[in-house]
């Protein structure tokens, strides 16, 4: 407790809890994703997020061919790679993301699967969270919902009840 003898606590420590309490978590199917970011917008816990990787970040990443998509829009992100990454250990399994996903003509880009089968996604989340730089400076994050989700949330890992309707709004501030 060196340096915090007065009882203060550093901000953002909830990200280290990694409770892994959900029986089911979302699985991203890149082939059906239209990159709308609606899933990230409705997630009460900021545990599903779009990451935009440049060539260097992609080369160093754990992703194989087909596990990211080329950015469609905005134009400032052309040539970069899109990945909707799930933090399976912080997800509470509410299913809001799956419910809101429009998908494409082949179906939704998200489905729920058991946590045990998705534990391999945890190191991928860690890679993105620690190594992929925010690209929010490339877009106007206040112009639309899609762009707003490229901003790093200032309210994350809230610990709110599964499916909480308030935290997505607080996350936008």
Outline where the language-model segments fall.
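Ferredoxin-type iron-sulfur electron-transfer modules and their immediate structural context
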Residues: 1-91, 98-171
């Amino acid at each position: 407790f060196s340096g915090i003898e007065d009882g203060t606590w550093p901000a953002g420590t909830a990200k280290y809890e990694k409770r892994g309490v959900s029986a089911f978590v979302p699985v991203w199917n890149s082939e059906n994703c239209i990159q709308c970011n609606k899933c990230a917008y409705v997630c009460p816990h900021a545990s599903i997020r779009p990451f935009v990787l440049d060539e260097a970040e992609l080369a160093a990443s754990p992703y194989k061919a087909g596990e990211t998509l080329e950015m469609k829009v905005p134009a400032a992100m052309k040539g970069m790679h899109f990945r909707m990454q799930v933090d399976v250990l912080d997800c509470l399994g509410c299913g809001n993301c799956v419910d809101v996903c429009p998908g494409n003509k082949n179906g939704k880009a998200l489905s729920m699967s058991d946590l045990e089968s998705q534990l391999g996604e945890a190191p991928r989340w860690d890679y993105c969270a620690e190594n992929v730089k925010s690209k929010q400076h490339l877009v106007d994050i206040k112009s639309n919902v899609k762009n707003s989700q490229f901003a790093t949330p200032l309210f994350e890992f809230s610990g709110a009840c599964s499916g909480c309707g308030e935290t997505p709004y607080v996350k936008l501030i």
